[in-house]
UniProtKB/Swiss-Prot annotation:
Name of this protein: Pyrokinin-5
Tissue specificity as recorded in UniProt: Expressed in abdominal perisympathetic organs and abdominal ganglia.
Record-level GO BP terms: neuropeptide signaling pathway
UniProt keyword list: Amidation, Neuropeptide, Secreted
Principal location listed in the UniProt entry: secreted
GO molecular function terms attached to this record: neuropeptide hormone activity
Organism of origin: Derocalymma cruralis (African cockroach)
Residues the record lists as Leucine amide modifications: 17
Entry GO terms, CC: extracellular region
UniProt-listed InterPro entries: Pyrokinin_CS (IPR001484)
UniProt keyword annotation of Repeat present: no
Protein family: Belongs to the pyrokinin family.
Compartments, as annotated in UniProt: Secreted
Function: Myoactive.
Amino acid sequence: DGDMSGEGKGMWFGPRL
């Protein structure tokens, strides 16, 4: 869970997705 994780946060979808 973080800004640069992208766990469905909706603000940044990086390597997590």
